[in-house]
UniProtKB/Swiss-Prot annotation:
Belongs to the ferredoxin--NADP reductase type 1 family. The gene is fprA. This is NADPH-ferredoxin reductase FprA. Monomer. GO terms for molecular function: ferredoxin-NADP+ reductase activity. Pfam families: Pyr_redox_2. Its EC number is 1.18.1.2. PANTHER family: GLUTAMATE SYNTHASE 1 [NADH], CHLOROPLASTIC-LIKE (PTHR48467:SF1). InterPro entries: FAD/NAD-bd_sf (IPR036188), FAD/NAD-binding_dom (IPR023753), Ferredox_Rdtase (IPR055275), Ferredox_Rdtase_adrenod (IPR021163). Keywords: FAD, Flavoprotein, NADP, Oxidoreductase. May serve as electron transfer protein and supply electrons to P450 systems. Its cofactor is FAD.
Length: 456
């Protein structure tokens, strides 16, 4: 027989790991005769979905379609969404831990890794976190306004985010106009000043973090040549590539195809530069050029391959630098934080030293993997959580009206709280705005507009 009382679960963060955790909690409760649950999801923005909305590139609608799974979870009567509420500002972690049976932190990695080189802060040098947020209409970044009038951009990093940034910079804006790219970004891209994007990676082709699909699709961008100097692949045998794994083997095959391509007159260019590190960014009041250093690969005693500076330098004119060398988790006030791993220390998802606080996603394991990686990660944490709930004292902790009191408490702390109904109003407005133009939606780019439409 199912018990009459309910375990109240809070999930802080509404990205993929948060929604996967919510779905896992609800599914586990369905399979249990001992546990009833109610899930409250708390989000700092008025909009849910995390990086699916504000991180996935606009020209990748298939990846964004996972939001349909999240919508299905949100329809469960045991689930509630509360947006525009910031943990550490409006409410504290200790207050959540006191009012909920369990709190799951799915806050991701909200900052970027710095290059730590001279000139990094010059106007025209921007973190990929900011640039991606800007073209995806994240309200925290809509005023960034990067100058895209120059002819050359340098993207530093050899992961998928670097490829996303490159595609947005080089793709015809008339193509992007049918996506959900932010209107302000589309207008900034329309003059098409950028003619060349140079992708710089400190290690070699065997050490890149690209997925093959993203690497290959660069060749499909109309009016753009993808160029790789054959010398950069010298010494890489089929055996070397195969030993590095399936994805790397396929990537090397794609890169080899790019080495034999002949540039076409009038085409824009994407140029790969491996074994190259940024040394200094120069310019008078803005980015004008970047000093690049040539590297060689060395293997340490533990078998790890690292890039070593050879001392050779080159100065390359550039007007835009996008730093895409990784994300960083940031501390949540009131919770432990490990600066070396940029995660919240945990054991099987349970926050170390805590009775009822848990973590999922990037803040649990670091910023690695793709969206789907978070599904198993979240499930593992929920398994730990459900075991703890099953072993807890089976007496009622809160009253029957606790859900109502939680909603009242949140509204008291944040009078501009966004509920599921408010988000649905935003969603309808954005979709309706996009429909006449053949776009999936036109995103509202700032907090005031989101709240105005949401609250009606």
């Amino acid at each position: 027989m199912r018990p009459h009382h309910i375990h109240h679960i809070a999930i802080v963060g509404s990205g993929p790991s948060g929604f996967f955790a919510a779905a896992s909690v609800l599914k586990a409760a369905d399979a249990s005769d001992e546990i009833n649950v109610a899930v409250d999801m708390l989000e700092m923005l008025p909009t849910p979905w995390g990086l699916v909305r504000s991180g996935v590139a606009p020209d990748h609608p298939k990846i964004k379609s996972i939001s349909k799974q999240f919508e299905k979870t949100a329809e469960d009567p045991r689930f509630r969404f509360f947006g525009n509420v910031i943990v550490g500002k409006h409410i504290e972690p200790a207050e959540l831990a006191e009012r909920y049976d369990a709190v799951i932190y799915a806050v991701g990695a909200q900052s970027d890794r710095a290059l730590n080189i001279p000139g990094e802060d010059l106007p025209g040098s921007i973190a990929a976190v900011d640039f991606v947020g800007w073209y995806n209409a994240h309200p925290n970044f809509h005023e960034r306004s990067p100058d895209l009038s120059g002819s050359r951009a340098v993207v530093i990093g050899n992961g998928n985010v670097a490829l996303d940034v490159t595609r947005i910079l080089i793709t015809d804006p008339d193509v992007l106009a049918f996506t959900d790219i932010a209107d302000h970004a589309l207008e900034s891209l329309r003059p098409r000043g950028i003619e060349e994007v140079v992708i710089v990676g400190r290690r070699g082709p065997l050490q890149t973090a690209f997925t093959t699909l993203e690497l290959r699709e660069l060749a499909d961008i109309e009016g753009v040549d993808v160029l790789v100097d054959p010398a950069q692949l010298e010494g890489i045998s089929d055996e070397n590539a195969a030993a590095a794994g399936k994805t790397t083997r396929q990537n090397i095959k794609v890169l080899r195809d790019y080495t034999v391509r002949t540039p076409k007159p009038g085409h824009r260019r994407i140029v790969f530069r491996f074994l190259t590190s940024p040394i200094e960014i120069k310019g008078k009041g803005k980015v004008e050029r970047i000093v690049l250093g040539q590297n060689e690969l060395v293997t340490d005693d533990n078998g790890r391959v690292a890039a070593k500076d050879t001392g050779v330098r080159e100065e390359l004119p550039a007007q835009l630098i996008v730093r895409s060398i990784g994300y960083r988790g940031v501390p949540t006030p009131g919770l432990p934080f490990d600066d070396s791993s940029v995660t919240i220390p945990n054991t099987n998802g349970r926050v170390n030293g805590s009775r009822n606080e848990y973590v999922v996603g990037w803040i649990k394991r670091g910023p690695t993997g793709v969206i789907g990686t978070n599904k198993k990660d979240s499930q593992d944490t929920v398994d730990t959580l459900m075991e703890n709930l099953a072993g807890a004292n089976d007496t009622e902790k809160f009253g029957a009206d606790h859900a109502d009191r939680l909603a009242e408490w949140l509204a008291e702390r944040q009078p501009k709280l966004v509920t599921s109904a408010h988000w649905q109003a935003i969603d309808r407005f954005e979709r309706a705005a996009g429909e006449p133009h053949g776009r999936p939606r036109v995103k509202l780019p700032n907090l005031a507009e989101l709240l105005r439409i949401g609250h009606g």
